[in-house]
Amino acid sequence: MQINKLYDDVYEIKDFLSKEEFDAVNYIINNTPEKDWFDEESKKKNNIPDFWYGKYLHFETENIFTTINTKMKNLFDSYSYYPDKLSLSRYKKGDFITQHTDQWIPDLPYYIGYGFCLYYNDNYEGGELEYPDLNITVKPKANTLYIHGGHILHGSLPVLDDRIRYFSTVFIHGTDESPTILNKELFK
């Protein structure tokens, strides 16, 4: 695992997953039927917004994404809440997410300390990750985790071809009593 600091509160971790973990994710990507991406029951149960319908795969049972989620959680010394499930997301041709910060809901009893985005493939055109206020635009490589502070403006550019971009995101919460603090040994 190689950690690169791109800017204050923006990190890139190459080769985040082991070969076995990476292969297990790709097995799910390559063997999930298209109909599973459009599960109405899961949409209702997990409050999946229309924007994410067909782009979001939620798992009810433990699998490789449980292992990955634990690995991500271990990058912290402190936090108030860390989600117990990790999902698989995808963007098809034309899909993107507009520039935003992860701390977008006012008056919450917590803040989003960090957002994580782990990329599983890089064989698509477009789909770059951008941090416009920092003048950073990157084409994420497969098996690379990006970490950014919840206050940092970011977004993605549209996927330009018919190859699908696969990734997982997670948001880590903090409070005044339990702030989000990255592992001091890893993030020096």
Positions of predicted regions on the chain:
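Short beta-strand segments enriched in hydrophobic/aromatic residues
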Residues: L17, I29, Q103, Y120, ...
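Histidine-centered catalytic micro-motifs
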Residues: F96-W104
